[in-house]
Structure formats: structure tokens, C-alpha cells
Amino acid sequence: MDEVEFILEEAKEGMEKAITHLKKQLSNIRAGKASPSMLGSVMVEYYGSQTPLQQVANVNTPDARTLSIQPFEKSLITEIERGIMLANLGFNPMNNGESVIINVPPLTEERRKQLSKQAKAEAEDAKVGVRNDRKQAMQELKKADISEDLLKSSEDEVQELTNTYIERIDKILTVKETEIMTV
């Protein structure tokens, strides 16, 4: 019985990783309103090494269309601007001497559809990951030295687990699509 529990736990961990990865990927897809996570991929030159923006500055959202970046050291303002430009996020940073301000433009209908398509592709990748974990668990169960009845009930359990995770992925996608399409 221990072997079966181990196989099921391993499958569950793999499926959970697919969900975590999906959430991380979707957080990089820009919806209508400004969010500090939009700048998650921005790297800044800091004392000769590339450092994530969040480690050298505070990122705030004063309103739904604005990002405000306060560097911990004022000397970093130009490096932060450069990092934002190099990240190729489509933002035009403005330097006011104290901080960097980014006005997030509203999304066009066409861009919303592109982002929605991108979100669907990420969700599909996550589903493929979950199905691969199911396939691996099924193969390991077949190799295990267990009775037919236990094999059948364990396979059913793996399928149930798979269905649960696929449903979670669909819910996450629906929320993100709603967020993207809301004007």
C-alpha cells in the first residue's frame, strides 16, 4: 500500500507544480490594470550584476493606470529606466528625479484577444503537464507489485486527481480571461 500512496503523492506534487507554474506565467500577462507583478521580469544593473527590480526599489500602484518605482538609492533611477526599456514590456518610463513613473496604457481590443490567446496557451501547457504526471503515475502503478483490484482503484484515484487539477486550471484561466477582457 505504501508504494501506491507514494506514486499518488508524487503525481499530486507534479500536478501542483503545473498549477504553480501556470499562476506564475499568467501573472506576467498584463491585464487592464497596473500591477507590480508586471515588472517581475525587469533586471537592473546594480554594482556590476543583474539584480531583480524588486530588490533595488519599491514598486507601488498609486492608481489603476500608474506604476510608481521608488529606488532605494537615487543613483539607480537611470539604471531602472534602462532595465524597464530592455525588458521590452511596451512601457515608457518617466523619471521625475525622485522616482520612475510608468503610465500603463489601456489595452486595445486586439491586444486583449492576443493576451487571452496567450493565457489559453499557458493553460493548455499546464494541462499537458498534468496529463504527463497522470501518464507517469499510471505506468508506475502498472509496474508496481499490486493486486488487480488495487491497481484499478488506484488508477481511478489518479484519474480523479487529474480531473480535479484540470478543473482548477480551467477556473484559473476563466478568472484571468475575465481580468484581461474587462475594460
Swiss-Prot record:
Protein's organism: Christiangramia forsetii (strain DSM 17595 / CGMCC 1.15422 / KT0803) (Gramella forsetii)
Record flagged with keyword Cytoplasm: yes
SUPFAM superfamilies assigned to the protein according to its UniProt record, in alphabetical order: Ribosome recycling factor, RRF (SSF55194)
Name of the protein in question: Ribosome-recycling factor
InterPro entries: Ribosome_recyc_fac (IPR002661), Ribosome_recyc_fac_dom (IPR023584), RRF_sf (IPR036191)
GO terms, biological process: translational termination
Family that this chain belongs to: Belongs to the RRF family.
Recorded GO MF terms: ribosomal large subunit binding
Role summary: Responsible for the release of ribosomes from messenger RNA at the termination of protein biosynthesis. May increase the efficiency of translation by recycling ribosomes from one round of translation to another.
Keywords assigned by UniProt, alphabetized: Cytoplasm, Protein biosynthesis
UniProt gene name: frr
